[in-house]
Each structure stands twice: as structure tokens, then as C-alpha cells.
Swiss-Prot record:
This is Large ribosomal subunit protein uL3. One of its GO terms (cellular component) is cytosolic large ribosomal subunit. Part of the 50S ribosomal subunit. Forms a cluster with proteins L14 and L19. It comes from Rippkaea orientalis (strain PCC 8801 / RF-1) (Cyanothece sp. (strain PCC 8801)). Keywords: Ribonucleoprotein, Ribosomal protein, RNA-binding, rRNA-binding.
């Protein structure tokens, strides 16, 4: 396991490859800085991990338990806490800062965030169902079709694709390429689109490769 970083989506832009001149669509992420708020060891917690905090806020935005937890290490009030499992946490100390420079251009990362909510959506928008004929006497324009058999089973199976809430769910986009890192301003430029709208909280971790 490896340490990731929490960040905020700022928006999308494009940069140009210096060799080919091609435009590369990128998402700009404000990555950190995060503060190490807890170091977990097998002796005290049964496993190895570190907890990091991100986004300083006023104390009234946190619960008393959260404020007490952070005051143990004299950390400022941090809105978001995230834990990363590690094989060895000895290199981290309470209060250490984790910044954007933990990544380098060319690294592959997984980005998790909450997708944009689109409210109650129908079958075509939510599941890309094919619509019916709009002419020739058809009355089946945007209907779903069959939802199952009759008396047996006598119900709609769970998981049946139907109209409902679309978006506003946790989404992970895997194997995105880090194009550029601005360590002075803690900015990471990631190739392609990532979940959410500007201001969305993101979790950026080194990409997980199956079998490794």
C-alpha cells in the first residue's frame, strides 16, 4: 500500500505537448497540503496506517470528538480525515506535511470523488436505453419495456435498471496519467476528466495494478 493525498477539483483546461504540439485535456487539482494526524502501528492498533487531515476550517464546523482528536497533536481544525494503509509507517511523524510532490509527471493514479448529481432521471439518460419510434403510430417513445415476467417470479428483481436518482455517487477513475506537478502551489494536472464539479473533494492514490 502507498500513501495518497486529498485534494479539491479546480476545473479543466488544456496544455500543449512540447514535442508533438498536441493539446492535452487536463484537470487541475489542488492537492493538499495534508497533515499527518495519527500514526497507527500493529502494537497499538493491530495494523499499520497513517491518518491525514485536509482543509482547515473553523472549530464550530467540527464535532467535539474531532476537535479533541486533533488537539492531541496541536493540529488545526481539519475538515476531512482519511486513512491510508501502509506496510511501514516509521517514516511518518505526527504533524508531517504531505504535499503534491509525492507524485511525479508520468505517474499513474486512481482518482475518487463524488460525481455530479443530476436528480431524478429517466431510462434513456440514466442507462442509455434505446427509445422507441417517434412516428408511425408508435406510443412507446421513452418507455422502459418489460420489467420482468408475470406471476413467476411475481416481482421485479433487485438491480433492475429503472428510472431514479442519477449521479451524486462515489466514483473512481483508474489509471489516469499525471501530466504536471506544481510543487510550489500544490497543484497536480491529471490527464482527462475526473468525477465531480469544481470544489469536489478528491482522493488521489497511486494506481492499483491487478496482480501486483
Amino acid at each position: 500500500m502507498a500513501v495518497g493525498i486529498l485534494g479539491t477539483k479546480l476545473g479543466m483546461t488544456q496544455i500543449f505537448d512540447q514535442e508533438t504540439g498536441m493539446a492535452i485535456p487536463v484537470t487541475v487539482v489542488q492537492a493538499g497540503p495534508c497533515t499527518v494526524t495519527q500514526v497507527k502501528t500493529p502494537d497499538t492498533d493491530g495494523y499499520t496506517a497513517i491518518q491525514v487531515g485536509y482543509h482547515e476550517v473553523k472549530e464550530k464546523a467540527l464535532t467535539k470528538a474531532e476537535i479533541g482528536h486533533l488537539k492531541k497533536i496541536d493540529a488545526p481544525p481539519l475538515r476531512h480525515l482519511k486513512e491510508y494503509r501502509l506496510d511501514d509507517s516509521s517514516q511518518y511523524q505526527l504533524g508531517d506535511a504531505i504535499k503534491a510532490d509525492i507524485f511525479n509527471p508520468g505517474d499513474l493514479v486512481d482518482v475518487s470523488g463524488k460525481s455530479m448529481g443530476r436528480g431524478f432521471a429517466g431510462y434513456q439518460k440514466r442507462h442509455n436505453f434505446k427509445r422507441g419510434n417517434m412516428t408511425h403510430g408508435s406510443k412507446n417513445h421513452r418507455l422502459p419495456g418489460s420489467t420482468g415476467a408475470g406471476t413467476t417470479p411475481g416481482r421485479v428483481y433487485p438491480g433492475k435498471r429503472m428510472a431514479g436518482q442519477y449521479g451524486a455517487t462515489q466514483v473512481t477513475i483508474r489509471h489516469l496519467t499525471v501530466v504536471r506537478v506544481d510543487s510550489d502551489r500544490n497543484l497536480i494536472l491529471v490527464k482527462g476528466a475526473i468525477p465531480g464539479k469544481p470544489g469536489t473533494l478528491l482522493n488521489i492514490t497511486p494506481a492499483k495494478t491487478v496482480g501486483k
